[in-house]
Structure formats: structure tokens, C-alpha cells
Amino acid sequence: MLLSQYFLPVLKEEPSEAQVTSHKLMLRSGMIRQQAAGIYTWLPLGLKVLKNIENIVSLNMNKAGALEVLMPCIQPAHLWMESGRFNNYGKEMLKFQDRHDNTLLFGPTNEDMITDIFRHNIKSYKDLPKNLYHIQWKFRDEIRPRFGVMRGREFLMKDAYSFDINEENAVKTYNQMYKAYINTFRDLGVFAIPVIADNGPIGGKLSHEFHIIAETGESTIYYDKRFKTLKDNPDIDVDEIKSWYAAAEEKHDINKLPISEQEITSSKGIEVGHIFYIGSKYSVNMKALINDEHGKLAPVEMSSYGIGISRLVAAIIEANCDEKGIIWPFSVAPFKVSLINLNIHDSKCVELAAKAYKDLSDKNIEVLYDDTEARPGSKFATHDLIGSPHQIIIGPKKAANNIVELKDRKSGNIEDIEVENLINYIK
């Protein structure tokens, strides 16, 4: 993509309305634009990140055996009345009437609807297990939306729902999805800790929150130092991982640690995922019954698995930034490479830039080629801000010898590379 043809409305000044780093950087880098309190338009750069995260989440859900569906944003209120949850959400749930005076709502979650889908289509234990997921926009009318997309009113979520014949099988599915979440966050390039949690209004028997470690996190997490090995050793047994200590500050008790205090560390964390073993709460209330192996009707056992896709964008930035801007993990970066031509009127610079652009594009590496008239200092500031993992810098002096500079955005290290060999260094 040529920057001269791209829509990248960067801001030079810090927006006064932004309170946290991710909100400031998303506005400054032209990722989003606020349309109302807690409601944002996703501009091209931000949408690319959102799609990259969505694709990684979907890939890991598919690997775990979940099947993708797409439920509507708008839900009939009678399903929530049937499940007994209609009044639980209070004013956070946006309710309205259609022209026929039917009460509808903008779904804040989907347990009720997925239970309705299940009960009308699956009747026998022979059709189990089933695991369905969707990625859809949701709305919660937060009384005080803040922190940009971290706590907006409209947000993108991945929700999965599993159905099993009994508790034993339901826990097996839960463990499979627990491992899928570990893999998902590893693939996203972030360090996430699973913490035992309360089920809240969702209900149920077993629950874990996943917190990305970031200095600006809202919660303090105390956890076993062995969690740091997950990035390099993803095949650790789920039961072993679940046995490691991890607790949020309100549940951490130094007098009840199962291991020595020296084996524990603490960090700030941002919650980005929550999984629940619900049990039969919804299936009993909504009569989602199946014929078991003995020919008797039994309520299906359910679990729910959520990941905040749009919230993840902000959380990843909070964990990967510096005073200059964003530092994207390679897997989610909107562009893997910023190609910076310092003199677009120098024929050799143009030649090398064209070659680098073609070579990288031919390998399906996404490149943002800065072919603008901006001054070098302005170009460096822009590309440091938007956070491409690699920067290729082409100036007249080194270009004369077929040399370009390759800068690693995270470390700041710069290497001189022959343009012919450039492709071998991008990964």
C-alpha cells in the first residue's frame, strides 16, 4: 500500500479527551474516530488490526473443534424473560419496541439465544458434543464509558458456547477451550495469565479470566513464575497449567499460598477473556433437554467462552508501546513493514524502494510504502507512531551502493542490508 493513497489521519498533538495510553495512540495514529460517547468508527489502520486479531481467534477456535455461526445483534426480549435474565442487566441493556410493539434488545451477550437455537435442533446425546462460536458487535449502555475502546459501549466479541451430555464431558470441553485460549494469546504475541474467577451474572460452577500483563493494567495479578514458560513451551498439560497459582489482588492471600512466596511474582493485568462452565442453568430454565443414553430427558450441560476482540486491540497497545508510539507484535500488525523512502526524487532510492516493495509483496508481506513528500523527521515520527515491527529506510548515500537500513521497531537496532537479501530478514 502506498501511503500517498492511504487514509491515515494522524494527529501531531495528544488528544485531550484520552485518559490512557492506548486511547491516545489509537486516536493519534488514525486507527479510530469517536462518533459518540463509547462509540467509534474504525478507520483503515485500526480495522486491519481488528481483522488480524479476529482471524487468529477464529483459527484457534476452529482448531479446538468449534463451528462458526453468526447470531443477530438484535434479539427478541422474550428469550431473556424465559431465561430469567431480562431484568438482571438493568439500564446497561438497550431495549426498544418495533412497529408491532414487540420488545427487542441490542444483545450484550448470547447465552439465551444460543440455548434457543440448541433446543430446537438437537434432541439426542448422539449429537453431542457441540461447540458453536460467533464474532459479533455488542452494546452495553455503560453509565460512564471511558478509556477508548477499552471500555466502550459498542464492542466486538468472540463468544463460544459448548454443549455436553454430562459434567465430566463438559469439563473436558472446558479444558480444551482453556488450552485454545492459551494458544490464542500466544499467537497474538501477548503474555496472558488465566486467573480463577467468579461467574457473575452468567452463572455456573467454574470460571477463569485471562489477563494480559501490562504496566497500565487495572488489576494486580499474583502468579506462579512458571507461567512465563508458556510462550516457549505451549504443549504443557492443561491440568498442570491449571494447578499453577494465579489470583487477582482481591483473592490473593499470602498466608494461603500453595508454593513459596519466592515462586510468586506480580504484575498489572487487563482482562481480555473470560470462560465459564455454566452447567444446566439455562438449559433448565429454557427446557433445552436431550435424550440421554438411557432414553431419559436431561438438561444439557453448557459452557461459555468470551474474548473481547476490540478490547484486545487496546490491551495489546498498552502492553506494547513506548514514548514514540505503538510497537505491534508481528502477528497482529496492520503492516509488517514500513518502507520509508527519504528522497522520492532520487532515482536510486526510487529503484530500491520499488524492488523492496515488490519482493516483500510477492511474499505476501504487508508493506506500507511512504512515497510522500514529507520531511525525514516527520516520516520517522509517523512510522514510529503506527508501530510496524520493521522499518526499511532508504536514503541516497547508502542506496548508491544498493544498501538499505533495516530497523527493528522494538529494539531500535539498525542494520545495513543489501537490498537483494532483504527478504531473508523480515519475519
Swiss-Prot record:
One example GO MF annotation: proline-tRNA ligase activity
CDD domains on file: ProRS_anticodon_short, ProRS_core_prok
Gene Ontology biological-process entries: prolyl-tRNA aminoacylation
UniProt entry tagged with the keyword Aminoacyl-tRNA synthetase: yes
Superkingdom in the source lineage: Bacteria
Pfam families: HGTP_anticodon (PF03129), tRNA-synt_2b (PF00587)
Catalytic reactions of this protein: tRNA(Pro) + L-proline + ATP = L-prolyl-tRNA(Pro) + AMP + diphosphate
Main location as per UniProt: cytoplasm
The entry's keywords: Aminoacyl-tRNA synthetase, ATP-binding, Cytoplasm, Ligase, Nucleotide-binding, Protein biosynthesis
Keyword tRNA-binding attached: no
Places the protein is found: Cytoplasm
Catalytic activity, EC: 6.1.1.15
GO cellular component terms listed in the entry, alphabetical order: cytosol
Oligomer and partners: Homodimer.
Similarity comment: family membership: Belongs to the class-II aminoacyl-tRNA synthetase family. ProS type 2 subfamily.
Function: Catalyzes the attachment of proline to tRNA(Pro) in a two-step reaction: proline is first activated by ATP to form Pro-AMP and then transferred to the acceptor end of tRNA(Pro).
Protein's name according to its UniProt entry: Proline--tRNA ligase
Name of the gene encoding the protein in the UniProt record: proS
